[in-house]
Regions:
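A surface-exposed beta-alpha-beta supersecondary segment
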Residues: 70-111
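Per-blade loop-tip surfaces of WD-repeat and WD-like beta-propellers in eukaryotic adaptors/scaffolds
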Residues: 4, 12-27, 59-74, 137-147, ...
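Surface loop/turn motifs at the tips and blade-to-blade linkers of beta-strand repeat domains
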Residues: 29-33, 153-156
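Short coil/turn segments within WD40 beta-propeller repeats
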Residues: 13-16, 55-57, 132-134, 178-180
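Structural signature of eukaryotic scaffold interfaces centered on beta-propeller domains
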Residues: 1-2, 41-45, 96-121, 158-169, ...
Length: 223
């Protein structure tokens, strides 16, 4: 919901509906684009809708930029049939997906993505996780179509839940299987083979085994 009480509802079929209040038909309906939607978040002002699918995120701009409803949100007035918003797909680069899966031996599976929130604060970042990795996207870089919009941090255990500290996008609250931590976003790194592999453990050092993806390795990638 937004700060004005507008509602966004998603289904396991993958479609999204926007309402300005309960008990009426949706003002805007965005048809299914692929996978089921497993989580949904909305910016406080209602401008942005963030949908989580298993292997990617969808960022939707609900502000109407033309026509008779110019300046209105999709929650307030219906989009014209030929001008419905086109979601931005936020995903990991195929090489990073392959390295993630090589490290975890598990398929990509995002937890519900969230905006940073706070009183009178603007959404500037997005956070989600998959396995032992936390990923944050910069809204500014996403909107500018930058090629490097996300950074990562790896843990030794799977991340159970994550969210930004209220009122700031500088710290992320991380729930692990047996503890809850707060980590500074500045410790996140650009995804590289080294940052995805994480620090070497004594076991790895003794065995001489490398977790880096080799040229002869075969991975099961959805791409």
């Amino acid at each position: 919901t937004t700060e004005k009480g507008y509602l966004a509802v998603a289904s396991n079929k993958g479609d999204i509906r926007m309402f300005d209040r309960l008990g009426i038909n949706a003002k805007t309906h965005i048809p299914a684009l692929g996978e089921p939607i497993i989580g949904l978040d909305v910016s406080a002002d209602g401008r942005w809708v963030l949908a989580t699918c298993r292997t990617y995120l969808l960022l939707i701009d609900s502000l109407q930029k033309e026509g008779k409803n110019e300046g209105k949100l999709g929650f307030e007035r219906a989009f014209a049939k030929d001008s419905k918003p086109q979601p931005r797909r936020l995903g990991l680069q195929p090489a990073h997906v392959a390295q993630f899966q090589h490290e975890t031996k598990q398929p990509l599976s995002f937890t519900t993505a969230r905006f940073n929130t706070g009183i009178d604060s603007t959404e500037t970042s997005i956070v989600t996780s998959t396995g032992p990795f936390i990923i944050t996207w910069s809204m500014k870089k996403v909107i500018a179509n930058r090629k490097d919009p996300y950074t990562i941090k790896r843990y030794g255990e799977n991340v159970m839940a994550d969210n930004f500290r209220f009122g700031s996008d500088k710290n992320v609250i991380v729930a692990l299987p047996n503890e809850v931590n707060m980590v500074a976003k500045r410790t996140f790194q650009k995804p590289t083979r080294e940052s995805i592999a994480g620090p070497a453990t004594p076991k790895r050092a003794r065995s001489g085994w490398s977790s880096r993806l080799g040229k002869d390795d075969i991975v099961n990638s959805p791409y």
